[in-house]
């Protein structure tokens, strides 16, 4: 799941996962 989230763009992940962009950015950065 982590790899799939990293591959998807932050904006798309927000809509799919429903998590705020800030949290998504932190995940991608890490």
From Swiss-Prot:
Principal location class: mitochondrion
GO cellular component: mitochondrial inner membrane
Record field: transmembrane: none
Localisation: Mitochondrion inner membrane
UniProt GO molecular function: NADH dehydrogenase (ubiquinone) activity
Keyword list, A-Z: Membrane, Mitochondrion, Mitochondrion inner membrane, NAD, Oxidoreductase, Translocase, Ubiquinone
Keyword check for NAD: yes
Domain of life according to the entry: Eukaryota
Membrane association type: Peripheral membrane protein
Catalytic activity, as annotated: a ubiquinone + NADH + 5 H(+)(in) = a ubiquinol + NAD(+) + 4 H(+)(out)
Subunit structure of this chain's protein: Complex I is composed of about 45 different subunits.
Record protein name field: NADH-ubiquinone oxidoreductase 18 kDa subunit
Annotated organism of origin: Solanum tuberosum (Potato)
């Amino acid at each position: 799941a982590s790899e799939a989230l990293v591959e998807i763009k932050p904006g798309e992940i927000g809509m799919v996962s429903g998590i705020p962009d800030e949290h998504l950015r932190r995940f991608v950065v890490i």
